[in-house]
C-alpha cells in the first residue's frame, strides 16, 4: 500500500487529520509496541513544550542555569507526564504549538505566529482558548491584523495530505462538529461531583437528592 492509499483508508476516526498523519508514520515502524510509539509522539512534543516555556520565561529570567531548571521542571509537571508519556494523549501537541506561537508574537514575528496558531488549530479545537491573547498582542502591535488570515490558511494547508488521500473539504471543515456530536457531555472522566452520579439517573431522584 502506498502513502496515498494509507491516508485514504487510515483517516476514518474523529481525530483530526494532522494527528492521524503522525499515527500513520509511526505505523510504519515494525516489531515495536504501538502504545510506546504513540506515547513517543507526545513525548517529542513535550520537549517542544518545555523549550517554548523556557523561551517565554527567558524573556524575563536571566541565566542559563535558571532556564535549564525551567526546562526540566516543565517536563516533570504532573499534567505533562500523565497526559503525554503516561496516557499517550495529544493535547501537548497543540499546547506546544500555541506557546511557540505566543513566543513568536512577542518577538514580533507576526506571520510565523499566526501560522503556528493555524497549525495548532488543525490538531485541537481547544486552541480557540488561546486566541483571546491575540487582542492584547495586537494592541501592543506584536501582531498585524492582516496576518490573521494565515490562521485559516495554515489550517487548510495542514489538511492537504488528507485531501490527497481522498478526504473532502467538507470533512476538514466539519471534523470538530463531528467530535461535538460524539461527545455530547458537559464533562467526561473529569474530576468533578458528576462522577458520583450514575449515568441516566432519573430526574425525580436527582431532585430528591438535592432538595
Label each PLM-derived region with a short phrase.
Residues 1-107, 138-211:
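Primarily membrane-embedded glycan-assembly and transfer machineries that use lipid-linked glycans
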Amino acid at each position: 500500500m502506498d502513502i496515498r492509499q494509507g491516508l485514504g483508508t487510515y483517516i476514518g476516526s474523529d481525530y483530526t487529520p494532522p494527528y492521524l498523519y503522525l499515527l500513520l508514520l509511526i505505523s510504519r515502524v515494525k516489531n515495536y509496541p504501538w502504545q510506546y510509539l504513540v506515547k513517543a509522539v507526545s513525548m517529542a512534543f513535550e520537549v517542544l513544550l518545555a523549550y517554548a516555556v523556557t523561551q517565554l520565561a527567558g524573556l524575563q529570567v536571566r541565566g542559563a542555569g535558571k532556564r535549564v531548571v525551567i526546562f526540566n521542571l516543565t517536563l516533570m509537571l504532573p499534567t505533562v507526564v500523565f497526559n503525554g508519556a503516561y496516557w499517550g494523549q495529544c493535547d501537548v501537541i497543540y499546547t506546544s504549538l500555541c506557546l511557540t506561537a505566543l513566543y513568536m508574537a512577542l518577538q514580533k514575528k507576526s506571520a510565523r505566529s499566526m501560522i503556528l496558531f493555524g497549525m495548532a488549530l488543525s490538531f485541537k479545537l481547544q486552541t480557540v482558548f488561546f486566541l483571546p491573547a491575540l487582542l492584547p498582542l495586537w494592541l501592543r502591535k506584536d501582531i498585524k491584523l492582516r496576518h490573521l488570515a494565515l490562521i485559516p490558511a495554515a489550517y487548510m494547508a495542514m489538511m492537504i495530505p488528507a485531501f490527497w488521500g481522498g478526504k473532502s473539504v467538507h470533512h476538514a471543515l466539519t471534523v470538530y462538529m463531528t467530535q461535538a456530536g460524539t461527545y455530547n457531555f458537559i464533562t467526561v472522566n473529569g474530576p468533578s461531583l458528576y462522577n458520583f452520579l450514575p449515568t441516566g439517573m432519573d430526574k425525580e431522584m436527582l431532585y430528591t437528592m438535592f432538595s
